[in-house]
Amino acid sequence: MNVSPQLLGYVVYTAIYNVYFHPLANFPGPKYLAASRIPLAFKRLTGEEVAMTYKLHIKYGPYVRVSPDELSTISTAATKDVYGHNTRAGGVPKDFKAYYMKNQRKDGTEGLLTAGDEEHYRQRKVFAPAFSDRAIREQEPLLKKYTDLLVAKSYEKCQTAGKVDMVMFFNFATFDFIADCVFGDSLHHLESMEYHPFLANITATVRFSAMRRVLRSFPILQAIFEAFMPKSMIKKRLEHVKFCDERVMNRLANDNPSHPDFWTLVEHAEAKGNGLTKGEMRQNGFLLLTAATETTSSLMSAITYLLCKNPEKMKKLQAEVRGAFKSTDEMNTITLPKLQYLQMAIEEGLRVYPPVPGGLPRRVVQPGTTLDGSASNMHIQSVVFYSQYASYHSPSHFARPHEFIPERWSQNPPAEFANDRLEAVQAFSAGPRDCIGKNLAYHEARMLLAKFVFTYDIELCKESSDWIKQKVYIVGAKSPLWVKLVKHERAD
């Protein structure tokens, strides 16, 4: 294959410019990453970006240049500039090139994830009451229903098979609960103990989104990919969206739902004349099902694994939960937040295994945008993101960063952890576009974890001993988490 001298010269010139003369040239990082977007793209496609970024921050410090125009940071001060309310003149808005769900509707409708800042604010204001403590208490019977089903069905499966995959069951429980809140009915995974095609497609959708993020940095490759994309793949994606849209519209057509759900309060806003369009409801329904299920089930799987790998922490949590309640019927959204070690275990789980371990990218669009008070080299169109995994495992932020130690979250932590930078953990992001479902996620995690460890003694199977070692395609590529369950017999 002959390469023209002109093309070769252009490639060499571009690489030299990127490494030595680009506005980001004085940020630290390997020269091969600064020279071209290709190495970072390869790491993203192979699921190795997070592992690479962690190692780079250990070597280079709080800022690392990971491609010609992309910076990764673990600076907690910089997160206020990147994600906060006071970004200068809107200088670091969301980088929509990284979000596959952008521009997916023919009518141009966008949801919370992909709407511009002003539109996001309007939609968020409508949705906010649906995620308040009051709304969650109204949805508590649903949450109890599906956590009870998870407890019963996981044990039933363990009895027949000798072990149970908790990744599957946490997927089932979180999806059935959120589907009931979005559709007005679940898809009955916990009853059937089989994956519904819609849930099975979500994992593929997330993986596909990661690939599309890479392709959007290479317009020619993206055009070729879309031109030759198999029709079966396009059809499957359209069917996936259509299924969700139809379910949402069926729920919205029901003027007398059997129980409160996300749309109950949203429809109140609509009645006042400041609600969402039907298209926005459909798009946000799809978003809620995708984002709210995958992340919570990932967190629950990780905490289960980490507790099994640290039996003394498991015993401490079980002692707290079993000492506070005589039965799971006493557990609710009022009593569970009072359990300190339960909350500490969840916070530590989010630190050790953030559900979205990479960075949420923001793109500089205004001159003079600051990072840590310095505006000298943040040129227009550069991208910056806060690398969660790298930050949470940095020895500059945490003592013994790779160990699962809930005690570091105590109001009076052991002296060894007194200087831990707890504010570095921003698993739900930060600022005006942080996760709207944070409150619900905490309540769901408390209920699932408390009932599970109250009811069972849990043993990790050998084949899952290294479960946490995963590649990352936006979220971790989880293998089955095999455990054995033994019912705990109370002395009283």
UniProtKB/Swiss-Prot annotation:
The keyword Coiled coil does not apply. GO terms for molecular function: heme binding; iron ion binding; monooxygenase activity; oxidoreductase activity, acting on paired donors, with incorporation or reduction of molecular oxygen. This is Cytochrome P450 monooxygenase rdc4. Pathway: Secondary metabolite biosynthesis. Its EC number is 1.-.-.-. Keywords: Heme, Iron, Metal-binding, Monooxygenase, Oxidoreductase. Radicicol is an important pharmacophore as an inhibitor of heat shock protein 90 (Hsp90), an ATP-dependent chaperone involved in the post-translational maturation and stabilization of over one hundred proteins, and which activity has been implicated in diverse pathologies ranging from oncology to neurodegenerative and infectious diseases. Heme binds at C435. The keyword Iron applies. CDD domains: CYP60B-like. It is an enzyme of class 1 (oxidoreductase). Its cofactor is heme. InterPro entries: Cyt_P450, Cyt_P450_CS, Cyt_P450_E_grp-I, Cyt_P450_sf, Cytochrome_P450_monoxygenase. Cytochrome P450 monooxygenase; part of the gene cluster that mediates the biosynthesis of radicicol, a resorcylic acid lactone (RAL) that irreversibly inhibits the HSP90 molecular chaperone, an important target for cancer chemotherapy. The radicicol cluster encodes only two apparent post-PKS enzymes, a cytochrome P450 monooxygenase (rdc4) and a non-heme halogenase (rdc2) that could introduce the epoxide and the chlorine, respectively. Belongs to the cytochrome P450 family. GO terms for biological process: biosynthetic process.
